[in-house]
């Protein structure tokens, strides 16, 4: 995992003492909220198996969830719900969830590393890191917390709405999901293709 710390070490060398990684889960699905996490790991800490959550199996993500939280100096997890997504759009709602997650951190970071190429909606000192979840340990840790938390939420929704089989796809578009969604559910997304 040392390669996961290379970029962060360069940032620490600039004089920063406390940085966090921020990532989200749920920007692509057709259903459910967007979930963001912010994590401050101790500098240079290696967590065996830590990587971009998309590269890990569900079982490996679940196995990393508690160790990441236990090892972190601080962590925060927050949602932007469907009504906020519809009001703000998915990017605005992602920023909202990220800001909420960063606000939970104590101590507060001096710099937030945001996965992706946009940070205009972040209310804190921040930098974008494209593919940050596979390049930065703090962002990789945040990606695991966000993905596991959102998946668990969608499992709860599966119990309330069994007709959508959220336990199988977590709200991401599948043929079964498209078939279960009627035109009356599409308010903000008028065109649905499959």
Identify what each model region corresponds to.
Residues 188-194:
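A short, hydrophobic C-terminal helix/tail in secreted or cell-surface proteins
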Residues 1-187:
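RNase H-like, Mg2+-dependent phosphodiesterase core
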């Amino acid at each position: 995992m040392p390669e996961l710390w290379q970029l962060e070490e360069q940032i620490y060398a600039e004089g920063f003492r406390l940085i966090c990684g921020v990532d989200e889960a749920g920007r692509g699905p057709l259903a459910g909220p967007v979930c963001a996490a912010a994590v401050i790991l101790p500098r240079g800490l290696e967590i065996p198996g830590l990587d971009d959550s998309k590269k890990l199996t569900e079982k490996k993500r679940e196995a990393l969830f508690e160790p990441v939280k236990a090892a972190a100096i601080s962590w925060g997890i927050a949602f932007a719900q469907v009504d906020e997504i519809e009001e703000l759009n998915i990017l605005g709602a992602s920023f909202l969830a990220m800001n909420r997650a960063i606000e939970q951190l104590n101590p507060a970071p001096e710099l937030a590393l945001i996965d992706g190429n946009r940070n205009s909606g972040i209310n804190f000192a921040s930098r974008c890191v494209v593919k940050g979840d596979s390049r930065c340990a703090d962002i990789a840790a945040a990606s695991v917390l966000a993905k596991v938390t959102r998946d668990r939420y969608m499992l709860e929704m599966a119990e309330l709405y069994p007709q959508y089989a959220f336990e199988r796809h977590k709200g991401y578009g599948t043929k079964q999901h498209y078939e279960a969604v009627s035109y009356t559910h599409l308010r903000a997304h008028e065109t649905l293709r499959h």
